Amino acid sequence: VRAGLDHPDAVQFLGILDVLPTLDTWDVLRGVDAKVAWHLYLMAQPVGLPEKMIRAVGPEFFGSFLDAWETDASTFPLEVRRHYIDSSVNAVDSIVADYRATASIDLDMDRDDREVGKQLTMPVGVISQDWGSQLGFDAASLWRAWAPDLTYEPIQAGHFMAEEKPAEIARFIRDLSARARP
């Protein structure tokens, strides 16, 4: 999203899988509903403790997301699961830094952009689970505030939708790329 806002002439189309705009994420995840994104709050903390905590139980930490966010246990065969977890454990610092940025510099930049009415000018496609029905928000409306040229499509899949529904995701990306700006 940031690349599309900062470099609109270089981004011909933007495809988003199962996330909300950063500013809206923090606005809608409040109270008990925030438990679905507890990891965001952990990784938003100052440098040091989150990294140590995650490293202490790295395989269990990353494995818990595979277990909770997939809707089909066959999505990640054992070898793929092991590779995903090992790669994530080896990238703890960068993963945490990326998440930490969503609660600091990314958030500040999004607030500034919203204040001046900056939007994504390219075609934007968002495909996601229907979190709004569970958590009480309209994801398409949240995205439309940032992207007037929006295609929004809910999908019956877990967070790892590209792995669970590859044909549907490929079709979505093909359709979106056909709308790319020249």
What are the residue ranges of the model-derived segments?
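Flexible "cap/lid" subdomain of the alpha/beta-hydrolase fold that forms the substrate-access gate
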Residues: 2-156, 162, 174-181
